[in-house]
Amino acid sequence: MLVNADLHTHSCFSAATSKDMVINNIAPKSREKGLNLVGTGDALHPKWLDIVAESTEYKGDGIYSHKDCDFILTTEVEAQHKIHHVIIIPDIDVARELSQKLVSPNKFIDGRPRSPLSGAELFELVKEYDCMIGPAHSFTPWTGMYKTYDSIYDCYEKKPDFVELGLSADTNMADTVKELSDFVFLTNPDAHSPWPHRLGREFNQIEMGDISYTSLQKALKH
């Protein structure tokens, strides 16, 4: 099945984000935009996880279902050198445990936690929990991975699961970087409000066996 997925959003708990970014607003607007699967964003924030759990029904295998669309747990972490990383998380129990494990001075305040960990250290931490990880908006000159590193392997030391392009780049641009030739590209809007001109401005069409964490994980390996 072909799934329309927006995998990078934020909640009402992130700085400079609309108070309207709650599940019961995001879900109907996602349906209006034609999205089947949406990242929750901010999945390391305990209060946001409570709202996700209260506003959805857990279908199993990482999917939290609302009548208008399905959700999967995602978060953005600002790590060493102010580089942003997107993390996709298997379920709420893992998210709560990872939140406790992550070294961050603001993880209970801001939906986008800051951490002193390097990209490689963050990679190793999230892989302990079978999460997926990749650089957020990789070419953005302020918080993108390539603003600091000449190579993605200098950042992570190992191959991450994907490269997010975001609004600052496209596939044609990223294809000029030889080391990215065997990477999966994702493109997401990094939405800070649920309105149709923000949510799903860019999204991914992913061939999946079904809507589940396992199917997404398999799809991103191809």
Explain the meaning of each model-derived region.
Residues M1-L37, P46-N106, D110, E124-Y129, ...:
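Charged catalytic cores and adjacent phosphate/nucleic-acid-binding surfaces used
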Residues A43, A136-T140:
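Short, well-ordered beta-to-alpha junction loops that form the rim of enzyme active sites
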Residues R112-P116:
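Active-site glycine- and acidic-residue-rich loops that bind
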Residues G119-L122:
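Phosphate-interacting basic helix/loop segments used at nucleotide- and nucleic-acid interfaces
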Residues G134-A136, N188:
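Short, conserved beta-strand edge motifs with alternating hydrophobic and charged residues
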